Amino acid sequence: MTATAETSTGTKVVLGQNQYGKAEVRLVKVTRNTARHEIQDLNVTSQLRGDFEAAHTAGDNAHVVATDTQKNTVYAFARDGFATTEEFLLRLGKHFTEGFDWVTGGRWAAQQFFWDRINDHDHAFSRNKSEVRTAVLEISGSEQAIVAGIEGLTVLKSTGSEFHGFPRDKYTTLQETTDRILATDVSARWRYNTVEVDFDAVYASVRGLLLKAFAETHSLALQQTMYEMGRAVIETHPEIDEIKMSLPNKHHFLVDLQPFGQDNPNEVFYAADRPYGLIEATIQREGSRADHPIWSNIAGFC
């Protein structure tokens, strides 16, 4: 039951949507059952939803599973090992929703950081900063939804990109070009229509498809390249209903070398830090759900 409070002005106030938990639990799991060790490096967030009204309206903590308990559960479950980040989140979600009657759902998210072996060494690694793998699990009653993703994957094409035919007005100074550098930091999230997935294999496949489409599409606009990247994923993976992407256009401007008596045949550029174009889109399977609630808690995507 929802409690209603009435203020001195007669305004009625009720508790709306809410969730709580422990954010960014730093977890490093070393699997050392052989001489060749494996590293899993995660940043895990656990947030619960359910009957927590009394905690908000009366300070009654009878239903409040402490955020410290949620943190401890992450570490305790890691001791048992896990194959993929998504499977780890599914186990956490199952534990909290089945272990506490008043917890009807929640949100569990993780970032996964990669480590590469140093010269194929058994237990020495260097941090791979080329990308971060992401995963979000949302449970609402009996429904489960997973969004996986990749962020910070920086890519560049030194040719094979054009930009022309755009509107011009009195504020337009950008020159048209038929040969430019195209560079971006790929951030992509894709929503599965099932949780029965080989998550590692699909992640590797999606990553490869995104890179292949970026490399092979002769680009007339970053929007076109983005669409081709998303289309390749949707056409290849029936278990994915939609993919959202956010691609900043990392501008590279040709430097004028004429003051120094030199030409510049598209070889010397200034890499601009900001401002930058920001291109975002959703590419989805026709007929699939376009407004899944899991996206309401994933910022930065249209």
Curated annotation (Swiss-Prot):
GO terms for molecular function: urate oxidase activity. It catalyses: urate + O2 + H2O = 5-hydroxyisourate + H2O2. The keyword Protein biosynthesis does not apply. Pathway: Purine metabolism; urate degradation; (S)-allantoin from urate: step 1/3. It comes from the Bacteria. The active site is at K22, T67, H251. PROSITE patterns: URICASE. Keywords: Oxidoreductase, Purine metabolism. One of its GO terms (biological process) is purine nucleobase metabolic process. InterPro entries: Uricase, Uricase_CS. Its EC number is 1.7.3.3. Catalyzes the oxidation of uric acid to 5-hydroxyisourate, which is further processed to form (S)-allantoin. Belongs to the uricase family. Homotetramer. PANTHER family: URICASE. This is Uricase. It comes from Arthrobacter globiformis.
